[in-house]
Amino acid sequence: YRPMRRAVLRADVDGGRWFVKLQRPKRHLEYLERMALLAPAGVTPPVVAAPAEGVTITAAAEGVSLAQALAAWSMQGAVEPDPASLLELLGRLPGGVRTLPPQRGHDVRLRMALETAAVELPGRASEIADLGERLLAADARAELGPVVATHGDFYEANIFTVDGRAVSVIDIESLGPGHLVDDLACLLAHLVVLPDLSPAHYGQVPGLIA
């Protein structure tokens, strides 16, 4: 996926499952540094090998993604995902993550999203601009808390669960210093749209969020 930027292939070999990530050389080195930083904490599947420039092989994550866990709970009455475990998982990110270069702030991403929305929906540009002003004003007043280690792309496809508990994350390229609310807001923003994407799979999710 992400043509010309990166791709991930699944390899099922001799009863085992591995994932092969292909990246540009510079991104590959940054990725390996982040994986080494996370390794002692056991919060992401380990690197098995880096056989060539731009190529990393990792083990498969234990359990199922939070997206799968939510669907199983909503449709089949499986164990309800534990929200507290999400905080515990984020709390296991090593403090050294705070020394990494910061990612783009959420205010920058918000402005980009507003600009894109205005282009795609020109008839509602005024409404979008008004919403943007209110969101940015609220953000300026918000108490964000201390700078902590953050995942940077914390949402249901990147979080893996076992028996409803969040135990690991994947896709750690956006790892860096930030605020806890950044990761939680990212997750919440993804969760609130799941019922619209697939009501049959995620119809119970609004109740969990509430």
PLM features: what roles do these ranges have?
Residues 4, 16-56, 64, 69-92:
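A conserved alpha-helical element in kinase catalytic cores
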Residues 7-11, 19, 139-182:
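Active-site acidic catalytic loop and adjacent metal/ATP-binding pocket
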Residues 39, 94-98, 192-195:
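Protein kinase-like catalytic domain
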Residues 55-56, 64, 152, 182-189:
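Feature representing long, continuous alpha-helical segments
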Residues 59:
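Conserved Hanks-type protein kinase catalytic core
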Residues 98-152:
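An alpha-helical support segment within catalytic cores of ATP-dependent transferases
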Residues 184-210:
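Active-site activation/catalytic loop segments of kinase-like enzymes and analogous catalytic loops
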